[in-house]
Amino acid sequence: MADPFANQIQNRNFLAPVGFKFTLSKYPKVAFFSNSARIPELSLGTATQPSYLKDIDIPGEKLTYGDLTIRFLVDENMQNYMAMHNWLKGIGFPETPQQFADQTTNVDGVRDPLEVFSDGSLHILNSNFQDVAIVKFNDLFPVALTSLEFDATETDINYFTAEATMRYTVYNIFDTDARTRL
């Protein structure tokens, strides 16, 4: 006989919003002290089937992925901020074409247009701060980076945070071994 509890949720703990970490494969040594990240929205377009009574929406065939925005604490040496800043400037090359050439040259000195992209991972952690799932983003690239506002009139020390907005081709959610899609 079938077990009536086989399809029940085994872990009754709720997922807390404080358990996550973000990494970029392009900058493995740069720590992103992320204090805010979200799995971007995912939407499916619809097509309208005309009818003499009421038009009927039917599922479309193209998914739309929202932007990935991470908010992170800026380290004292500004390494994480400058990594995003220089990556963005390298893609947009506002001063010289050499900036783009530098951005698209890999560590072996070979030009590779794919160097403008990086894969990234958002690790979702449980209440014991162990991986529950890994959201893998393919072909990330930055499109916006917030400013840092210096203010000598501040009476309290508020550490800088910055937001980086990135686009990507697709994301997938994997289990903790990063091999099986959930």
What are these regions, as identified by a protein language model?
Residues 1-182:
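Glycine-rich, low-complexity intrinsically disordered segments
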